[in-house]
Amino acid sequence: MTTHIPLPEWTDLIAAVLSLPPDEDALSKSWRGQDNAAIWYSRGSWVLAAVAKQLAQSKTASPLKFWIPDYFCNQSTVALREVGAKLVFYPIGEDLVPDWQRCDAMAKEEQPDIFLAVHYFGRPMDMARARQFCDSHEALL
C-alpha cells in the first residue's frame, strides 16, 4: 500500500508507549505566574464551566450571566448549562463582529457577568472594544 503520509518507525511507536508523560509544571512554567498553579482541561467548554462555577461561588446574585455570541456551537455550552449559568446570546453581524450598540442596550436590561469574545476563523476580534464594553458593564472578559 502506498500512502502520502509518513508512517512512524517502530522506535517511535515504542517510545510513545514507554515514555513518561510530560511534566505539566514544566509545560506551563513560561506563561503562569510564579506562585500560581496550572489546571489542564481536555476541552475548552470544561474551562468555561470551571470559570463560571468559580465566579458563581464568589458572587451573591444568581444565576451567573454568561454572554456568548449568537453564532456559537451549542455543544460547547452544555457544560455551562450543567453548572447553572444563564446563557445570554449577544448579537453579531454578518462580519462576525459584535453589534456593540445592541450589546450596550441589552446590558442595560441584563448586565453580563462574563463576556466571551470569539475570534472567528482566525480573524481577531477588536479586543480593545471588548475590554471597553466589559469595563463599562463590570464584566469579566
Model-derived features with residue positions:
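Conserved PLP-anchoring active-site segment centered on the Schiff-base-forming lysine
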Residues: 52-110
